[in-house]
Amino acid sequence: VGVSGTGGGFKRFMAGETDISDASRYIKGKEQQGCAEAGIEYIELPVAYDGLAVVVNKANDFATTMTIAELRAMWAADSASKKWSDIRAGWPDREFKLYAPGQDSGTFDYFTETVNGKSGNCRPDATFSEDDNVLVRGVAGDPDGIAFFGLAYYVENKDQLGVVAIDGGDGP
């Protein structure tokens, strides 16, 4: 038994260190190839799907809804945005703080691909952790914190966090 993010789990699976690998995404082509090269046969068995939540500190009363373009302006690797006011006129002229799952996380892969157009495309100045509880504590303790992680972590901590409605183009 091992604990890691999805990417790390697949690395251990391909190395023969684990027999089962749960994941928050489908196995990637390079991971399929790694299994084939190692002589490992596998099956994908979807058991459940998780939601993804973008969250802010409970005291944040302005970032209640954001567009994909606004998220990209915050999270993309080439983003120069530093303050909430850089994201939307009328928001505070204070620096935001980004918290994100580690780069071995399937949640990280999904978010960066969906929001920023490429898996792994994320600015390096975020605070990264494979432990979502660390991200929860970071945002809960930082009035200008923002993070993304599995919906279950928001539900467990909604007394400390606010969830951001995402407008994908048709309204939140």
Q: Language-model segments: which ranges?
A:
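Exported/periplasmic ABC-transporter solute-binding proteins
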Residues: 1-172
